[in-house]
Amino acid sequence: MKLYSVSIIIFVLIALSTIVNAQQAATDSCNSTLPLNDLTFNTSLLQCTEAWTPQNFILRYARTAENTWSFILSAPDSSAFIGIGFSTNGQMIGSSAIVGWIPSDGGSGTVKPYLLGGKSPGEVNPDQGDLTIVNGSLKIESVSSRLYMRFQLTATLPRQSLLYAVGPAGFFPSSPDFRLREHRFVTTTTINYNTGSQSVVKVSPHSKLKKTHGLMNMFGWGILIIVGAIVARHMKQWDPTWFYAHIALQTTGFLLGLTGVICGLVLENRLKANNVSKHKGLGITILVMGVLQMLALLARPDKQSKYRKYWNWYHHNIGRLLIILAISNIFYGIHLAKAGTSWNGGYGFAVAVLALTAIGLEVRKFLKK
């Protein structure tokens, strides 16, 4: 019995020791010895910084030759790709990145440069970007459950806004396209290459306001107003239901659009944006036309009035012009915000559905004559 108890205790101690050793092996710090032996530059020059504490990213770097910067990024091997991006403004779009991974099946590691052209996977292009990489310097290896990705850049001073990312667990890019999937975790920092100090860049406090501005205008001016116009043109056989539906849709669309315009004005004031004058001008024009359309309801002549045909001409054509300007300005706003293909594709699909519906109803109306 005593022998059995002693055996259990020894087993537990060995298990605990194994767990502790594994945790220590998967952890790196600036005080740790770099476990790489085949480096072609003087490692004593390397500066070290805890790049991303929650993910235990450690970045070592140095200017190891004239206009040559050597980097070693280490991170836990979580069966996912790791990446570091170099940005001019702290934003993902337009940045260039170095991404590396080692497949769980024991395959060889891969490191590739990527151009972060947008937020969707299709806009993140391998073997592109504006980083000048020293030939043969891209390499990644796994040591004690930890990835060490190294590369060298030719630059007077690399960009100081750095992006770090961890890919989805179990996914590894593969040939022929080497497309990445959306990362699980991401952060943005700024680094002082002289001191090694890094600071995390907080997410813009205006991101929610931007999204609200876009969605309100998109659903208000860009969808509901169009649906209301379709109802008024093609549903008159259901009188007076069509009229009340038309009023409800246009009023709701106007209120959403008004909210979107107000959000846009607040956003412009907070961001001190200087490249939105055309977008703002179109938005205010659309709002004025919307107000005129709402006021037109109060001045609507009777059907028997000789002025009714002029009112109809005004109401219909101002409405058509409003819709054209609204669609154009929404796409222009998406372009200014660099929102990517998801917004363009989503709204483009909605407009296409509405256009096909309107065309189909027009054809049916023509055939009935």
Curated annotation (Swiss-Prot):
* Gene Ontology terms: cellular component: membrane
Q: Which cofactor does it need?
A: heme b
Membrane topology is: Multi-pass membrane protein
CDD domains recorded for this chain? Cyt_b561_FRRS1_like, DOMON_DOH
List the molecular function annotations (GO) for this entry: metal ion binding
Q: Start and end of every Cytochrome b561 domain?
A: 174-369
Designated name of the protein? Cytochrome b561 and DOMON domain-containing protein At3g07570
Q: Which residues form the signal peptide?
A: 1-22
* A family per Pfam: Cytochrom_B561
Q: What does this protein do?
A: May act as a catecholamine-responsive trans-membrane electron transporter.
Which organism does this record belong to? Arabidopsis thaliana
Alphabetized UniProt keyword annotations: Electron transport, Heme, Iron, Membrane, Metal-binding, Signal, Transmembrane, Transmembrane helix, Transport
Q: Which residues cross the membrane?
A: 212-232, 247-267, 279-299, 321-341, 343-363
Q: What is known of its domains?
A: DOMON domain could bind catecholamines and thereby could regulate the cytochrome b561 domain function. DOMON domain could bind one heme b.
Kindly give the InterPro entries that the UniProt entry links to this protein.
Answer: Cyt_b561/ferric_Rdtase_TM, DOH_DOMON, DOMON_domain, UCP037471
Q: Which residues form the DOMON domain?
A: 55-167
Cite the PROSITE patterns for this sequence: CYTOCHROME_B561, DOMON
